């Protein structure tokens, strides 16, 4: 499953996780097994480009599949992605490229509730992406950062600085502009205006639910991970492995598997390309995790956090390039404001983390991934 969407979308005090995620990872994933360095692998430009390319690839592939005529096999899509991810990381582990712990029934029992939250997060995200354009989807994902940040304040003793609060204001403003631009375009375009507005409203509702599910997933993972000390590839392994049986049951019971619906979701002319996109979207989650580790290893967590903020621009632009997202002054303005809000937020976190920590309880946490930060917390206790 595309858990990394969470990942790169949320650089927060406690973890950064996406659209990860998210991805859900936001800063320093576990480092793969070290290999002899070379001038190519040590070049910081290459991992940054690989990370950005992986993020764009995952978003575009998901949108391609979900933008089909009345595509309604979302649980099946997530199941395929999870299976592909498990096969990929098992292969990488066998080849010595990555390492993670073996399956444990006790650890699986502790982690299962988090996998259920992840399913909710990814499913609602897929529904939102189905109804909204990539630029609008990317902009609204920023709102999850606000929910997570204040969840940190309530439950983990975090804090919100003035500059951070300003970035939140820009995020809200960009979302308002994006929604206004979408509705304005729907009203002014030809065709059934009421149907287009209804589609947008459905997308906004799914986006709201997705923001709530994502913040619940991240904050819940922060607590649960203390019981397991998981690293990032451990979380990827258990999240996808535990999700597969649940998704198989959900797709079998809740989705229409009649021959007519299968033909509608997988038209004969596009069947091969749709299946290829589904497989590639599953692989892209592995690419994101690996390139995240590569990026942090050859640069720094600070550089990585800035790359995550800057990465929102090419992801949003990919929707304008590869799909029929409207290119208007309001829509471009929303992307620009959202882009600036991400940069301001990253700068605010860097400045906050640079301040000396005083007192027993930390008021800010490093820009690291959920698994890494929570493991440190458990070691302190």
From Swiss-Prot:
Its localization reads: Golgi apparatus membrane; Cytoplasmic vesicle membrane; Endoplasmic reticulum membrane
What PANTHER family does the annotation carry?
SOLUTE CARRIER FAMILY 35 (PTHR11132)
The GO terms describing molecular function are: GDP-mannose transmembrane transporter activity
Q: What is its main location?
A: Golgi
Record topology, Cytoplasmic segments:
1-39, 90-109, 151-159, 221-232, 295-302, 348-381
- What protein family is recorded? Belongs to the TPT transporter family. SLC35D subfamily.
Recall the taxonomic lineage recorded for the source organism.
Eukaryota, Fungi, Dikarya, Ascomycota, Pezizomycotina
Q: Which gene encodes it?
A: gmt1
Q: What is this protein called?
A: GDP-mannose transporter
Function comment: Involved in the import of GDP-mannose from the cytoplasm into the Golgi lumen.
Regions that span the bilayer: 40-60, 69-89, 110-126, 134-150, 160-181, 200-220, 233-253, 274-294, 303-323, 327-347
């Amino acid at each position: 499953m595309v858990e990394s969407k969470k990942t790169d979308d949320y650089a927060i005090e406690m973890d950064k996780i996406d659209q990860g995620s998210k991805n859900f990872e936001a800063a320093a994933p576990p480092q793969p097994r070290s290999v002899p360095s070379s001038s190519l692998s040590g070049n910081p430009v290459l991992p940054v480009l690989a990370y950005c390319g992986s993020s764009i690839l995952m978003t575009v592939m998901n949108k391609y599949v979900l933008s089909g005529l009345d595509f309604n096999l979302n649980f099946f899509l997530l199941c395929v992605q999870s299976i592909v991810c498990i096969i990929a990381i098992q292969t990488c582990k066998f080849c010595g490229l990555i390492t993670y712990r073996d399956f444990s029934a006790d650890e699986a029992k502790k982690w299962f509730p988090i996998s259920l939250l992840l399913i909710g997060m990814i499913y609602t995200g897929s529904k939102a992406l189905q109804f909204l354009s990539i630029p609008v989807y990317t902009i609204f994902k920023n709102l999850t950062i606000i929910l997570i940040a204040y969840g940190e304040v309530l439950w983990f003793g975090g804090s919100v600085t003035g500059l951070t609060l300003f970035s939140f204001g820009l995020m809200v403003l960009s979302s308002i502009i994006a929604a206004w631009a979408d509705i304005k375009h729907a009203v002014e375009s030809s065709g059934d205006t009421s149907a287009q507005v209804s589609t947008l409203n459905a997308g906004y509702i799914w986006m709201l639910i997705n923001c709530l599910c994502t913040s619940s997933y991240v904050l819940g993972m922060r607590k649960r991970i203390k019981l397991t000390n998981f690293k990032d590839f451990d979380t990827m392994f258990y999240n996808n492995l535990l999700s597969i049986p649940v998704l198989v049951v959900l797709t079998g019971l809740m989705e229409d598997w009649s021959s007519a619906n299968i033909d509608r979701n997988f038209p004969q002319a596009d069947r091969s390309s749709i299946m290829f996109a589904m497989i590639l979207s599953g692989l892209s989650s592995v690419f994101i995790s690996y390139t995240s580790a590569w990026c942090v290893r050859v640069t720094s967590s600070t550089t990585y956090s800035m790359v995550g903020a800057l990465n929102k621009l090419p992801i949003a632009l990919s929707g304008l390039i590869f799909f029929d997202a409207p290119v208007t002054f309001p829509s471009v303005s929303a992307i620009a404001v959202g882009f600036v809000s991400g940069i301001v937020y990253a700068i605010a976190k860097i400045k906050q983390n640079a301040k000396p920590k005083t007192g027993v309880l930390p008021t800010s946490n490093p820009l690291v991934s959920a698994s890494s930060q929570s493991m440190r917390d458990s070691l302190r206790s």
